Amino acid sequence: MGDNKNNGDSGKLLYCSFCGKSQHEVRKLIAGPSVYVCDECVELCNDIIREEIKEISPKRDSDKLPTPHELRAHLDDYVIGQDRAKKVLSVAVYNHYKRLKNASPKDGIELGKSNILLIGPTGSGKTLLAETLARSLNVPFTMADATTLTEAGYVGEDVENIIQKLLQKCDYDVEKAQRGIVYIDEIDKISRKSDNPSITRDVSGEGVQQALLKLIEGTVAAVPPQGGRKHPQQEFLQVDTSKILFICGGAFAGLEKVIEQRAHVGSGIGFGAQVKGEKEKATISETLTQVEPGDLVKYGLIPEFIGRLPVVATLTELDEEALVQILSQPKNALTKQYSALFEMEGVELEFREDALKAIAHKAMSRKTGARGLRSIVESILLDTMYDIPSVDGVVKAVVDESVVKGESAPILIYEHNEAQAVSGEQ
């Protein structure tokens, strides 16, 4: 291999066979049989190949678009329950990508963009549904928190930063980013602070809704390359957001009261008021299914913003039975994840049925939905995961109801069939 020094024996100056530069003009010269190539030409060839791959890959990705049934089946593998929401999402996502695939409208009919609004309590699976869809379609996915966004010119995150994050996920490939999915969480937190427009500017509420309007509907956003700060001399990447699918989600706490007032159900005041008991709590989810655009306006979203989210799907609160299923049934269920961790140590991990029910019951009492399951399982297994790498001969660990309740430690079974509780104090 040559480098940027003279050829030792002959003192002959070497040149790149492609660009003609001498070994003194380049960093490295690679030698072949009577041929030399410099590092600059190698890099140029790499760039040409990368560009060709970029041109081919979008076509290859879009060859086969999964049907709504196939999308739903993929969601079923990872998300428990929420059947209605899965169906709504599958159809909306299928129609969106069908619109992109058939970009040239027939008979002058231009297909409108159908962004999605997900309404459901914390831990009901809103984020997981969006993530799973993106994975199923093999498209870039990014998440944004609406509470961190502010209008341009104010302290906080600019809405265009959302597109920047999406570009980062696909290595600043604009074509790929334009086929991506953006999930904006906590969208209910940017509702207007009061029904009446105020003289003081609401930069984190209505102001953010206004800023998001064009982005969600479709505009060409100018984004600085590689995350640089904007300055006049810089060339921007032009991203067409009309091709990006936006999914907005929020808990919308108290929205059911707005719906009930409209429907004149349970709106009594004083001694004659209807009070919901424990058994009637499930009706809140049922009430949310009756949501109309006017209810969302009253809640604090501006009409123009609601108009950009024509597809609305409501998610129900997960019950104890659903949480038990979430722990064990999906492809990436928590019990399967922790079993895989234990397998790396050569140990089998077993969760008994009563343990799963106890974990689900604890999560229900914390009112965190499926989101709280991981922290419970982590705390149960902490001492065991701490001890096992230092203990020889362990083949199995068993978790039962008493472990979840904190009454005992997980049982360790050794090679010689000896059962012993982990002390957790080693």
Swiss-Prot record:
What SUPFAM superfamilies does the annotation carry?
Glucocorticoid receptor-like (DNA-binding domain), P-loop containing nucleoside triphosphate hydrolases
Molecular function in Gene Ontology: ATP binding; ATP hydrolysis activity; ATP-dependent protein folding chaperone; protein dimerization activity; unfolded protein binding; zinc ion binding
So which domain of life are we looking at? Bacteria
Task: Output one GO BP term.
Answer: cell division
Which cellular component, as a GO term, is one annotated location?
HslUV protease complex
* Spans through the membrane: none
Q: Which residues bind ATP?
A: P121, T122, G123, S124, G125, K126, T127, L128
Which keywords does the record carry?
A: ATP-binding, Chaperone, Metal-binding, Nucleotide-binding, Zinc
Which residue range or ranges hold the ClpX-type ZB domain?
Answer: 4-57
Q: Which positions bind Zn(2+)? A: C16, C19, C38, C41
InterPro entries in the record: AAA+_ATPase, ATP-dep_Clp_protease_ClpX, ATPase_AAA_core, Clp_ATPase_C, Clp_protease_ATP-bd_su_ClpX, ClpX_bact, P-loop_NTPase, Znf_CppX_C4
- UniProt-listed Gene3D superfamilies: 1.10.8.60, ClpX chaperone, C4-type zinc finger domain, P-loop containing nucleotide triphosphate hydrolases
NCBIfam families named in the record: clpX, PRK05342.1
This molecule's function is given as: ATP-dependent specificity component of the Clp protease. It directs the protease to specific substrates. Can perform chaperone functions in the absence of ClpP.
Name the family the entry cites. Answer: Belongs to the ClpX chaperone family.
Q: What does the subunit comment say? A: Component of the ClpX-ClpP complex. Forms a hexameric ring that, in the presence of ATP, binds to fourteen ClpP subunits assembled into a disk-like structure with a central cavity, resembling the structure of eukaryotic proteasomes.
> What is the protein's name according to its record?
ATP-dependent Clp protease ATP-binding subunit ClpX
The gene it comes from is clpX
